Amino acid sequence: IHTMGRDDSRSDLYRYPYEPTPYCVLERMANTGMIRKGNTLLDYGCGKGRVDFFLSAQTRCQSIGVEYDDRIYAKAMENKKAAASGARTEFVLESAENFPVPVEVDRVYFFNPFSLEILRKAMARLLESYYENPREIQLFFYYPSDAYISYLMTVPELEFLDEIDCMDPVSYTHLRAHET
């Protein structure tokens, strides 16, 4: 599958460029045990499907990727044909704010894919799904903006649980050595 490369050809003030999550970060997520075989992961701004394919393969979860850009969505669908975890992965061509969240979704991934305005609308859809079928839903944010964090802290249904250390151990050791 081909998921590399940044694509900002259709980005604007509301929808940010496609940039794949590094595999080392996905490995750390998979190794936390927070995503398992019985889970359904929703990946907002899925791009070419890296998060969906990797986590479906590593954790055996079901995965739904939502992408608004038809060109990038087409690349995800091409990748699905070649991916070993393609049968556990579904892609939907839709904007996040209009996507009705399926009641089985219990894990959600965001790599800062869109503006705060769109995040608010996506969260409203997510909460609608939660109230339709109450369940524990875990949200994962990779590089959340300060605006995201400020907003999320005002949503009464949310509770901060933990951070996953995604720093590269080699870089971290190097940084620590220079701090003394």
Where are these regions (language model features)?
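S-adenosyl-L-methionine
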Residues: 1-36
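Conserved small/polar residues in nucleotide/adenosyl-binding loops
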Residues: 173-180
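Conserved class I S-adenosyl-L-methionine
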Residues: 38-45
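A short, conserved alpha-helix within the catalytic core of class I
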Residues: 116-126
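Conserved SAM-binding motif I beta-strand of class I
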Residues: 63-67
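Conserved SAM-binding loop
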Residues: 76-77
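Conserved SAM-binding strand-loop segment of SAM-dependent methyltransferases
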Residues: 86-94
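Glycine-rich SAM-binding Motif I of class I
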Residues: 49-53
